[in-house]
A protein has these predicted regions:
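Sec-dependent N-terminal signal peptides
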Residues: 7-13
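Short beta-strand-centered segments that line the small-molecule binding cleft or hinge
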Residues: 131
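N-terminal secretory/targeting leader peptides
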Residues: 21-127, 137, 145-347
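C-terminal motif of bacterial Sec signal peptides marking the signal peptidase cleavage site
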Residues: 16-19
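Thiol/selenol-based redox catalytic cores and closely related redox-interacting motifs
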Residues: 142
């Protein structure tokens, strides 16, 4: 009897050990799955931490990382600390795990017609532009960008109309003569400032502050938010309201990276950048008046300009791009005319 009981006890003990071993193995497996490394995607931008676009991007990155439950780790690099502009777009097009938040003009290096859509003196309001980017015309450009390895997540990251910040007041194109003005490395900006009468000097935005101090340039062009956020008012005190271009950033991710993500990850990224664009616009609209007053408090003088004279001056810019699709300007104006009519009629 004792022998039988011993055998039963031994069998039960063996089963207990097997069960414990299985649970331990399952726990180890689950732990391994939990510790799966997150997909790291770098997000780079020229905007400094104090600028609204950078603040909105912080929210976007945090939301994506939280919603992905550890499968994604977006890392934000502001102030041009990692490649931006032309170099940043190359990272995207070449398939890096990379998101660039920078001017739409850098998309123009791959799909030239983007520069036509964001050309000088086109828009009178943010709403006109935001409706334009939803037209079939612009959606077709996004499809062309995809063929070049660039997935356009958003064209909606507005930061205000661009004006002239300089050491002298500007009223007419004649006042621009001889002025060395910083511009992004972009033919669109170069041709626009030349047409307006200035002398464009291409350089990365983070270098602008020192260039003003050292007299390398006499001023720059940019939005009220950028002018205040980067403290350029410490070097120049005249702000002339040319409104020659609309300040807007594109959000672009590598197609290779995008295609390798899960459907859920793609949805999270798209939704959060869309929300971020709305947040950025809302805050931008609120801050423009506030920052204008702060600039005045810091000794900056605002100047209205001869808009008609500048409109005439920049008209030839649209003939300087042989790579643009023939008739693209007419198509843009056709869409813009309809957009203005719809806005007027409350549609």
């Amino acid at each position: 009897m004792k022998k039988v009981l011993s055998l039963i006890f031994l069998s039960l003990f063996t089963l207990f050990l097997v069960a414990c071993g299985g649970k331990k193995e399952e726990a180890t497996k689950n732990e391994g799955e939990t510790k799966k490394e997150a997909r790291v995607i770098k997000v780079t931008t020229k905007f400094v931490d104090d600028e609204q676009t950078a603040k909105s991007l912080v929210k976007v990155v945090e939301a994506i990382n939280k919603r992905s439950n550890g499968s994604l780790e977006l890392q934000l690099f502001t102030s041009g600390t990692l490649p931006i502009g032309k170099d940043g777009m190359e990272q995207v097009a070449n398939g890096s795990d990379w998101i660039l938040v920078d001017g739409v003009n850098f998309l123009g290096d791959y799909v030239p017609d983007y520069n036509a859509v964001t050309g000088p003196m086109l828009y009178q309001s943010f709403e006109e532009y935001l409706r334009m980017v939803k037209t079939p015309l612009v959606q077709d450009l996004n499809a062309q960008a995809l063929e070049k390895g660039i997935k356009v997540l958003s064209l909606d990251w507005l930061f205000g109309f661009r004006n002239i910040e300089a050491k002298k007041a500007i009223k007419t194109p004649e006042d621009m003569k001889g002025l060395k003005l910083r511009v992004p490395t972009s033919q669109l900006y170069t041709f626009t400032i030349e047409a307006m009468g200035g002398n464009p000097v291409a350089m990365p935005y983070p270098d602008t502050y020192a260039a003003l101090q050292q007299g390398v340039i006499d001023g720059l062009e940019g939005s009220i938010l950028s002018f205040y956020g980067t403290k350029q008012y410490e070097n120049v005190k005249e702000y002339s309201l040319t409104r020659h271009l609309l300040g807007v950033s594109a959000v672009c991710i590598s197609k290779k990276c995008w295609d390798s993500l899960t459907d859920e990850e793609r949805t999270i990224i798209q939704e959060e950048f869309d929300k971020g664009a709305e947040d950025n616009l809302t805050e931008t609209e609120k801050l423009e008046d506030e920052y204008a007053q702060k600039l005045k408090d810091n000794g900056v003088t605002f100047h209205e300009v001869d808009a008609e004279a500048f409109n005439k001056a920049v008209a030839p810019v649209y003939d300087k791009f042989p790579k643009w699709t023939p008739g693209i300007y007419d198509k843009i104006m056709e869409n813009l005319t309809q957009i203005r009519e719809d806005i007027k009629n409350g549609k």
